[in-house]
A protein has these predicted regions:
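Conserved beta-alpha-beta core of the PfkB/ribokinase-like small-molecule kinase fold
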Residues: 149, 155-208
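Short, contiguous strand/loop micro-motifs
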Residues: 38-40, 65-66, 125-126, 157-158, ...
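Short gly/ser/thr-rich secondary-structure transition/capping motifs
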Residues: 2-4, 129-137, 191-196
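Non-catalytic pre-domain segments flanking phosphatase-related domains
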Residues: 1-2, 147
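General beta-strand structural signal in soluble alpha/beta enzymes
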Residues: 19-20, 91, 123, 182-183
């Protein structure tokens, strides 16, 4: 028999979590092969915030994930993967080609380490759907309605200016609505400079 494992608030009622970020297609050579030697790849999905949502759901926490994916087989498969792991995806946006012209799902290649050989990751996420979507269309107040906890990371704002604006607006809305906010800085030097990350995090601090 399965049991829920709610994270409790001060009044002992379970919290509802929402995370925002990019979910990506993960391609991995089987049997610890190196990418340069691979003739096939195993497909799965992942992403920092998506993994958090999945981990919470696997521990019985009411967990929701918000992102933008292209309205095609890859995007729908990513949503299906989340739902199969008990993550709520009601707010997810499946974008049209008009809304996100490149119509891409971000991809990364994972070369799994073996023994003393470290794992390696190659990202192919430029012009993904989440980086091209106009988030001014989203009613953030309605999106966060009914949630108690918002989790964000420093990866999403580093992806593109529209994502940066989304995270700031999301933080302001969460503050206004009284949500608890957790923020994982998670600096990625391949996405933006240390100075850009510092300035952004400084702007975020009043809302965390």
């Amino acid at each position: 028999m399965e049991h829920s494992n709610p994270i409790l608030m001060g009044n002992n009622s379970p919290q509802k979590f929402i995370t925002i970020g990019e979910v990506m297609l993960r391609l991995t050579p089987p049997n610890y092969e190196k990418i340069r030697m691979a003739s096939a790849f195993e497909a799965s999905y992942g992403g920092s915030e998506a993994n958090i949502a999945l981990a919470l759901a696997n521990h019985g926490v009411d967990s929701t994930f918000f992102s933008v994916v292209p309205n095609n087989s890859l995007g729908k498969s990513a949503v299906r993967w989340l739902r199969c792991n008990d993550v709520h995806c009601t707010p997810m946006i499946l974008s049209t080609k008009e809304e996100t012209p490149s119509h891409r799902l971000g991809t990364y290649y994972l070369e799994t380490g073996y023994g003393i050989r470290a794992s390696k990751v190659i990202y192919d996420r430029k012009h993904s759907a989440i980086t091209e979507y106009d988030f001014s269309q989203v009613d953030l107040d309605a999106l966060l309605d009914g949630f108690d906890w918002l989790h964000l990371s420093g990866i999403t704002p580093a992806l593109a200016p529209n994502c940066r604006g989304l995270i700031i607006d999301m933080l302001k809305t969460a503050k206004k609505k009284g949500l608890t906010v957790s923020f994982d800085g998670n600096f990625r030097s391949t996405l933006w400079s240390w100075e850009e990350a510092r300035d952004f995090c400084t702007e975020c601090l009043p809302y965390v």
